[in-house]
Amino acid sequence: MITVATAECFTHANIGLTIHKAAAGYEDFEFKYLFSEEDLKLMKNVRVISAMFVPSIIGVEKLLDIKLPEPDFNYKYAKAYSEEKDLEVAKLMAEGLKKKLNVNISIGSTAGVGRGAICILTDNNRYLFTSDVYANLITFENIKERQKNGIEKGIKRFLEILKKEYF
């Protein structure tokens, strides 16, 4: 059984929830179109331990026992970084989650100003990438488009990695 956990910000736990729904055999769910029949069969070997939406620095630091860098931008109570720091923070989140829950695959996501970042950490490798959509959390420019693209890209990459490393 392959165990998975996510700590997500800009993707609002949708990567983890979608993986859970596919693994649990839900008949219909929002991003089902990303899964082939073969993918859905493989997902029977996956268990989601946790899928979290964690927008705040204090939430990430306390839940994952990690220290995050200072935000690049002031934004209400949530964290807002530049794309460069988003890449660092997504990696820190995935590492903290993997250490805390001892899962096979951990996923972290965060986005402030830029394309955001997603990190998928497996037992053997780290995959760090951005969405394809530039957005600005401070002005709300393109944030819904970036979110959808990040969810889709995160799920697609998860499936590629799952097949490459575990099946």
UniProtKB/Swiss-Prot annotation:
Superkingdom: Archaea
InterPro entries per the UniProt record, alphabetical: HcgF
Cysteine disulfide partners in this protein: none
Pfam families listed in its UniProt record: HcgF (PF06787)
Family per record: Belongs to the UPF0254 family.
Protein name in the entry: UPF0254 protein MJ1251
Species this protein is from: Methanocaldococcus jannaschii (strain ATCC 43067 / DSM 2661 / JAL-1 / JCM 10045 / NBRC 100440) (Methanococcus jannaschii)
Organism ancestry: Archaea, Methanobacteriati, Methanobacteriota, Methanomada group, Methanococci
